[in-house]
Amino acid sequence: RRINNDCQNFIGNRAMYEKVDWICKDCANIFRKDGLLNNCRSNCFYNTEFLWCIDATENTRNKEQLEQWAAILGAGWN
């Protein structure tokens, strides 16, 4: 299991991290594009690939919650 070092608040928020990371994993499995998984995870999910993957995995109804969780995990960049 890979730990995203960009996420300052991973410890204590593992369940939250796994939910956000699942978006990137699912997106990478759907599109099989080289580098997509790492790009989606970069900057603790604060990037355009993550937002694109939310839409691509049909999770737009949860977009606000997913962005909030990413902000909590990466506290300091938002």
UniProtKB/Swiss-Prot annotation:
One of its GO terms (biological process) is circadian rhythm. SUPFAM superfamilies: Crustacean CHH/MIH/GIH neurohormone. Its main location: secreted. Disulfide bonds join 7-44, 24-40, 27-53. PROSITE patterns: CHH_MIH_GIH. Produced by the medulla terminalis X-organ in the eyestalks and transported to the sinus gland where it is stored and released. It is found in: Secreted. GO terms for molecular function: neuropeptide hormone activity. Keywords: Disulfide bond, Hormone, Neuropeptide, Secreted. InterPro entries: Crust_neurhormone_CS (IPR018251), Crust_neurohorm (IPR031098), Crust_neurohorm_sf (IPR035957), Hyperglycemic (IPR001166), Hyperglycemic2 (IPR001262). GO terms for cellular component: extracellular region. Belongs to the arthropod CHH/MIH/GIH/VIH hormone family. Represses the synthesis of methyl farnesoate, the precursor of insect juvenile hormone III in the mandibular organ. This is Mandibular organ-inhibiting hormone 1. The lineage of its organism: Eukaryota, Metazoa, Ecdysozoa, Arthropoda, Crustacea.
